[in-house]
Amino acid sequence: MSTGLKHEILQDSPGKRVCLLGNLAIVRGGLEAGVQFFSCYPGTPSSEIGDTFARIAKEADVVFEYSVNEKVAVEVAFAATLAGARAMCGMKHLGLSYACDPISTMPYVGVEGGMVIVSAGDPSLITSPNEQDQRHFSRFLYLPVFDPATPEDARRMTRYAFGFS
């Protein structure tokens, strides 16, 4: 049963300020950039991104998919962007290692609609048992890395990343 109320992240009220954590700010930035497809393999510290897209997908007109692993999540998002959609893919920090095979070919093939990969890190071991700083992946994958310091940075950088891609 629908209440007719939009999820707060979907409300379009220019000038209205809302308090969002970083993961939700990334979702909002993707929506503002016109994301049409989102895939992910859920895992902390990135779980809220995929879970939020799962809840709002129909109302936001975003195709959403939980994938069987991070590699598949990247591959289906890449296929969506090759078809012209603006695509996002989300994963935890350790998943980036697993998804490197398809990611490493993307700079050479290029994208059509724009693609942003969100790899939520945990360099201080706050929410995960493994420490990894995935910013170093930029060097050998030949892809830019955006490293937001605040939720507002996360929203803006997600929008900017789509334009950059």
Regions inferred by a protein language model and the residue ranges of each:
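Thiamine diphosphate
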Residues: 1-158
